[in-house]
Amino acid sequence: MEPIIRVDHLTHTYSAGTPFQRSAVKDMSLDIYRGEFLGIIGHTGSGKSTLIQHLNGLLKPTGGRIFLNGQDIWADPKKIRQVRFQVGLVFQYPEYQLFEETVYKDVSFGPRNMGLSEKEIDRRVRASVHAVGLNDDVLEKSPFALSGGQKRRVAIAGVMAMEPKVLILDEPTAGLDPRGCEDILALLRSYHAQRGSTVVLVSHSMEEIACNAQRIIVLSGGDVYLQGTPGEVFAHARQLETVGLDVPQVTKIAHALHEKGVPVDPAVYTVEALQKQLLALKGGRAVC
């Protein structure tokens, strides 16, 4: 499968040449494939935020290259703005970046900067607002009059409105209650299924990653530590613990059962999958 984004021996050093020099990413290489739902996870300081800021050209590599559709994004610095239209980045707590008088103006900011017609801008604004579960009633409201969860949705809609080929979200559920978290994740699943765009979810929550990502990349110390399907990654529970990460609670239970001789897959990562295996062992009969 051809990657839509390729990271080739990426290195990034902050404050290079000063006493405060720090390498955040060290010779990192990875691929992101067209149409996949990718999860990126890592402990604080693993290089997650630095990596994703390179993917749409917000940071320039100290060394190495970033390819988008086979083209080095920094081959012509004058075109880096076009890269940012194709690779949309939603920062953590994106609602803090809302600034316009109305929701309509805020969501239309990106498409307007793309030089689109008013008709196309209007189409994109309404489609994106609907995609995040809001209706036209909010369009003329001040974004600052909305609830916290609604503000987050509007901020995400503003990036979706550019219709990027790749949508990257940094901790999109941070600070939300469980219902709010699931609402955001559900809209991302729906967006991915309907648009066929590549979605990259950066999270500290193993449960979020396990239940949504088709593939996972684990970062540690500024480089790729593990990658694979959720089952492949969570099979390495002990290795994950050594880099300060945990596995989903259901995987912990499966590991404990497996160690006690119960023939279940220790890498199972959803409640439904573990329940199915346990019911099969009981001959399909549910037990209270």
Q: Locations of the language-model features?
A:
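Conserved catalytic motifs of ABC-family nucleotide-binding domains
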Residues: 163
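Conserved ABC ATPase signature
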Residues: 142-146, 150
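ABC ATPase NBD Q-loop/coupling interface
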Residues: 65-82
